[in-house]
Amino acid sequence: IREMAKAAADKGLEAIALTDHAPDMPGSCHLFYFQNLRVVPRNQCGVKLFLGTEANILDENGSVDLPDSVLAEMDLVIASIHPPCYKGAKTKKDITNAYLAAMENPHIDIIGHPDDGRFMVDYEAIVKKAKETHTLLELNNSSLRPGGFRVNTREDDLEMLRLCKKYEVPISI
């Protein structure tokens, strides 16, 4: 963490956010890592640190793979659907419900990359819920990479952005 803060300081950044994938993502950090983030100083090398996680949405009920007690200690929580972790039904209605339910969790700040065409979603419904719950929707740069693994992202991003503009919902990039 200190090395990243130093690199950020060297680039003149005032703040950075560090959001490692939560434990159910293969190769990610153990629960203990996330529990111990609360003791990490939030200012290092003159750079403000926002420490959190990218939690995995596990099912259509919006459950995530970290307990609320741990999420409550974080500065920033992103919740995303990832193929290795999501075990719920995969219809458009079920995926939409997964996002809507996750946004009801007061500890979740951002819905990560909802533009992945492998998980079709009702964008109007999630944009309206994002406005209601003050949850940001992420436009992920990996989604825009030519030849990326996510499908239909350009069209999905344009639809999401059009609706975010219409309903005045801010996004996260």
Explain the meaning of each model-derived region.
Residues 14-15, 19, 109:
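Short acidic/polar active-site loop segments enriched in Thr and Asp
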Residues 5, 9, 103-104, 165:
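Non-catalytic positions within long, well-ordered alpha-helices that form the structural scaffold/packing
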Residues 2-16, 36-44:
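Alpha-helical scaffold segments that flank or form the walls of functional sites
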Residues 21, 169-173:
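Short acidic/histidine-rich active-site segments
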Residues 22, 27-139:
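Extended substrate/RNA-proximal surfaces in nucleic-acid metabolism proteins
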Residues 136-149:
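His/Asp/Glu-enriched short active-site or ligand-binding loop at hydrolase and phosphoryl-transfer sites
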Residues 14-15, 48, 136, 170:
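Residue-level detector of anion-binding/catalytic polar loops
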Residues 155-165:
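A short, acidic, amphipathic alpha-helical segment used as a generic capping/interface helix at domain edges
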